[in-house]
């Protein structure tokens, strides 16, 4: 019981850090959009034409889609295959459980969720880092 409490506390702290990183990414996107559409004096930017706006938005959406695809592949490889290699008794999870004893325990679900959040944090960090490296003037984040 004590171990479960420690796991819950650790996962709670981990979730808070994950949501902090996610809110930071949203803030960066809002700053990027504001910088894209408005000049410094909060007037609509006339110097940029609509095709330039569209090019920047398509670039940003394309970047996001690529990282979502990479993240999906990494997460599926990270979750499914190592579990089957290191714990072959979990192979039955690919089929429907025959009785209630075949379902996952709470600690297994908690540790899987924790690993998933860690992978998502790394994915967000790598995505924002790649945008900063490839096109540093477009991300709108002043560090």
From Swiss-Prot:
Q: Which UniProt keywords apply?
A: Membrane, Transmembrane, Transmembrane helix
Q: Which organism is it from?
A: Saccharomyces cerevisiae (strain ATCC 204508 / S288c) (Baker's yeast)
Q: Which GO terms describe its cellular component?
A: membrane
Predominant cellular place of this UniProt entry's protein? membrane
Miscellaneous:
Partially overlaps SIN4.
Q: Where in the cell is it found?
A: Membrane
The transmembrane segments are 65-85
Task: Tell me the membrane topology, using the record's own terms.
Answer: Single-pass membrane protein
State the protein's name. Putative uncharacterized protein YNL235C
């Amino acid at each position: 019981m004590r171990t479960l409490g420690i796991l819950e506390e650790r996962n709670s702290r981990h979730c808070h850090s994950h949501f902090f990183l996610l809110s930071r990414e949203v803030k960066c996107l809002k700053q990027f959009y504001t910088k894209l559409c408005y000049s410094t004096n909060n007037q609509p930017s006339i110097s940029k034409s609509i095709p330039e706006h569209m090019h920047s938005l398509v670039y940003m959406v394309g970047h996001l889609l690529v990282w979502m695809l990479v993240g999906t592949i990494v997460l599926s490889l990270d979750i499914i295959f190592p579990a089957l290699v290191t714990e072959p008794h979990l192979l039955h999870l690919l089929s429907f459980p025959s009785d209630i004893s075949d379902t996952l325990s709470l600690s297994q679900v908690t540790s899987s969720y924790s690993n998933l959040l860690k992978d998502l944090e790394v994915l967000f960090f790598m995505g924002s880092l790649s945008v900063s490296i490839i096109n540093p003037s477009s991300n709108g984040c002043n560090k």
